[in-house]
């Protein structure tokens, strides 16, 4: 039996994290959406298309895993999820007011997490209609359920709605902007175009669905040895039962020859991500002189695929990402009728046609397909080294957007440095491929915790800067205005310490604790030392202090903390400098906040974060809502307890800092000595090398 005194109950209360433009952080949206679906406990055949029972007939259509508008608003009023582990108890609760609940429902719709099966062209929520999770929404739920270690699998994960493998982006922990490089954009482009041209036709067969075993990452290995007692209720095996998780003949409920048409107004069009964007083949352009282009696609189709098949939640962010395909020279516009592509502005439209550039064609490497040539009226072909502009052709250039658009040039890694783990970890594209390799090797947690700890260390540097600023202000000034600054710094200090503790708890409960969902293979003494700190009876984690949630002053803790490391909202600036190479000098327990661990080891390369260019806040009243996201219970103690807990909190963080750094270095050693060596021998690595060679030639 687990000692109750050594069971960690982490309690905190906070608002949604927001970007500089006021948008809710992507991870917060995915979390509240997942808990929302878990609390709804959706079942099959719950609702029919006709809500009046006396009108039901044999021809009435039933929709699986649906819920009503009223059920959604009511459920969000009191969301609660409890996950019991060996030494921790995670209790997550949200109490969301109706105004914010309606706004979140709208966000879930615009993010393609929900749709209305009765009216698949509807893009906004409405009362008296049924809502249903999309394949993208189910994929988000699947990831959350696995990460948090939920013992009971939601039924929808075993259905045909579970069919999507999302492309997931890494984001800045400060601005929530996408961390990208040219190489990552190239990988995304290859995935979007598919293994072969996906030419749409009403007679096409439905896209095949991946088997559930690959989506659930489930392997029924009876040879696995463990010292723990068999507890079927803690796993998913009992739920799977007689379901054939290797079935390759599954059919998606969203498959439809009309709603998958790239010209349709369907809210959701893609239910698998590996088939590629839907193209038009041999489409004719021009008025007096007809010109036929082998493969074309619209900007609406690009945007639709990004929204359906990646974890992007905000519409304008998808537009910015789609524009990067043009910026990097992978696609070129068609400026002949019926295409209505703007010469100076990238816009999303069903009538804005593009085709692959020569560079884009080289990257996709469709086997068995001829080059994407343009056939002129006289029968001759125009190679895609040239781009159509009106009735004349000019050479295709890589630079298709001005620097004034706010896009920063990313530095490409070279093939000569590809055999170094540091460079692979630094480039978002190579890191993505390395992550996929680790997933196949069943050790992706080594990379995940390595990055999580680096973010924790970055937070600690910000905390140290705040402490230093407070001490400097106390020594130099005592005026009223300076006292206000000190109060602001105090508020920021408590918020920053709060976030550091939350990150420490997440790292511990997800990777280090015995029985955690992604338990690391580390030395027993190291695990025990961390557990002694986290589970100490007098740890401030058991009396977690709240931040001031209702302070309307502009000098809030959030603004003070974010001002330390921020980027301009209208540019693709640089992300926080989180070193992805472990420090060579380990700190001891008495030496807190050592600067050696934060030196930027690879200054010659800085991936760029993708930031939205415009503010998108359709409902101002919602933005000012005092609705609270609560983890555990409602902490409404006064600030006195917060101040009293602060020294103990810093003491815990000082003790955790060197231990987490040791874990980070150990994970780096494991990846460098084992996983990376296997990665360099894999087919994925060889393909990456070939792709980089193509980049260097372009």
Swiss-Prot record:
* Pfam family of the protein (one): RGS
Keywords from UniProt, A to Z, are: Pheromone response, Phosphoprotein, Signal transduction inhibitor
Q: Please give the SUPFAM superfamilies that the UniProt record associates with this protein.
A: Regulator of G-protein signaling, RGS (SSF48097), Winged helix' DNA-binding domain (SSF46785)
The induction annotation reads: By exposure to pheromone.
The stretch of residues making up the signal peptide is none
SMART domains per the UniProt record, alphabetical: DEP, RGS
Q: Name one GO biological process term.
A: negative regulation of signal transduction
Domain annotation DEP: ranges: 273-358
Please report the stretch or stretches of sequence annotated as the RGS domain: 420-689
Is the Transcription keyword given for this protein? no
Region of interest (Fungal-DR), ranges:
10-203
Q: What does this protein do?
A: Desensitization to alpha-factor pheromone. Is involved in regulating the signaling pathway for responding to mating pheromone.
Q: What else is known?
A: Present with 5980 molecules/cell in log phase SD medium.
Q: What is this protein called?
A: Protein SST2
- Natural source organism: Saccharomyces cerevisiae (strain ATCC 204508 / S288c)
């Amino acid at each position: 039996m687990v000692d109750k005194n050594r069971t960690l109950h982490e309690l905190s209360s906070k608002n949604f994290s927001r970007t500089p433009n006021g948008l809710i952080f992507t991870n917060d949206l995915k979390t509240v959406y997942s808990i929302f679906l878990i609390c709804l406990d959706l079942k099959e055949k719950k609702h029919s298309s006709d809500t009046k029972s006396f009108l039901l007939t044999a021809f009435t259509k039933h929709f699986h895993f649906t819920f009503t508008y009223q059920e959604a608003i009511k459920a969000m009023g009191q969301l609660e999820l409890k996950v019991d582990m060996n030494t921790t108890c995670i209790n997550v609760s949200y109490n969301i007011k109706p105004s914010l609940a309606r706004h979140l429902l709208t966000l879930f719709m615009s993010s393609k997490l929900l749709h209305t099966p009765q009216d698949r062209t509807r893009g906004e929520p409405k009362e008296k209609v049924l809502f249903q999770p999309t394949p993208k929404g189910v994929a988000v739920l699947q990831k959350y359920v696995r990460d948090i270690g939920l013992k009971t699998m939601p039924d929808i994960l075993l259905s045909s709605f579970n069919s999507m493998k999302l492309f997931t982006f890494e984001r800045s922990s400060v601005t929530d902007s996408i961390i990208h490089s040219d190489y990552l954009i190239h990988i995304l482009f290859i995935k979007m175009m598919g293994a072969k041209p996906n030419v749409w036709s009403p007679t096409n067969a439905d896209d095949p669905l991946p088997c559930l075993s690959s989506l659930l990452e489930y392997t029924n290995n009876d040879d696995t040895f463990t010292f723990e007692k068999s507890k079927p209720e803690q796993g998913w095996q009992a739920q799977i039962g007689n379901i054939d998780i290797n079935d390759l003949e599954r059919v998606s409920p969203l498959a439809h020859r009309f709603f998958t048409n790239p010209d349709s107004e369907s809210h959701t069009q893609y239910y698998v991500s590996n088939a590629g964007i839907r193209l038009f083949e041999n489409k004719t352009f021009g008025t007096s002189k007809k010109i036929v282009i082998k493969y074309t696609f619209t900007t609406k189709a690009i945007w639709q695929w990004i929204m359906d098949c990646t974890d992007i939640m905000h519409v304008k962010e998808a537009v910015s990402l789609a524009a990067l395909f043009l910026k990097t020279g992978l696609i070129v516009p068609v400026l002949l009728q019926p295409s209505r592509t703007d010469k100076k502005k990238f816009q999303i439209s069903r009538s804005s046609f593009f085709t692959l550039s020569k560079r884009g064609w080289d990257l996709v490497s469709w086997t068995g397909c001829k080059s994407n040539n343009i056939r002129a009226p006289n029968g001759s072909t125009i190679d895609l080294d040239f781009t159509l502009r009106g009735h004349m052709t000019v050479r295709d250039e890589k630079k298709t957007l001005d620097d004034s658009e706010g896009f920063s040039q990313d530095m490409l890694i070279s093939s000569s440095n590809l055999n170094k783990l540091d460079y692979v970890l630094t480039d978002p594209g190579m890191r993505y491929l390395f992550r996929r390799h680790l997933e196949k090797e069943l050790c992706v947690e080594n990379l995940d915790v390595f990055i999580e700890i680096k973010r924790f260390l970055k937070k600690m540097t910000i905390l140290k800067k705040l402490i230093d600023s407070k001490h400097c202000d106390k020594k130099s000034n005592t005026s009223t205005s300076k006292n206000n600054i000190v109060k602001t710094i105090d508020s920021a200090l408590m918020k920053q310490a709060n976030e550091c503790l939350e990150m420490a708890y997440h790292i511990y409960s997800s990777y280090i604790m015995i029985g955690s969902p992604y338990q690391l293979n580390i030395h027993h003494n190291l695990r025990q030392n961390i557990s002694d700190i986290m589970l100490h009876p007098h740890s401030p984690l058991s009396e977690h202090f709240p931040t001031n949630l209702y302070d309307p002053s502009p000098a809030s803790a959030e603004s003070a903390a974010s001002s330390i490391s921020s980027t301009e909202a209208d540019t693709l600036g640089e992300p926080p400098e989180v070193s992805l190479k472990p420090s060579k000098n380990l700190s001891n327990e008495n030496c807190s906040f050592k600067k050696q661990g934060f030196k930027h080891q690879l200054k010659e390369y800085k991936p760029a974060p993708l930031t939205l260019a415009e503010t998108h806040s359709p409902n101002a009243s919602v933005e000012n809502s005092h609705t609270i996201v609560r983890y555990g219970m409602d902490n409404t103690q006064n600030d006195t307890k917060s101040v009293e807990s602060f020294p103990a909190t810093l003491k815990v963080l000082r003790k955790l800092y060197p231990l987490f750094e040791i874990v980070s270095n150990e994970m780096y050693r494991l990846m460098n000595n084992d996983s990376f060596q296997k990665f360099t021998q894999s087919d994925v690595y060889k393909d990456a090398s070939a792709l980089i060679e193509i980049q260097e030639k372009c």
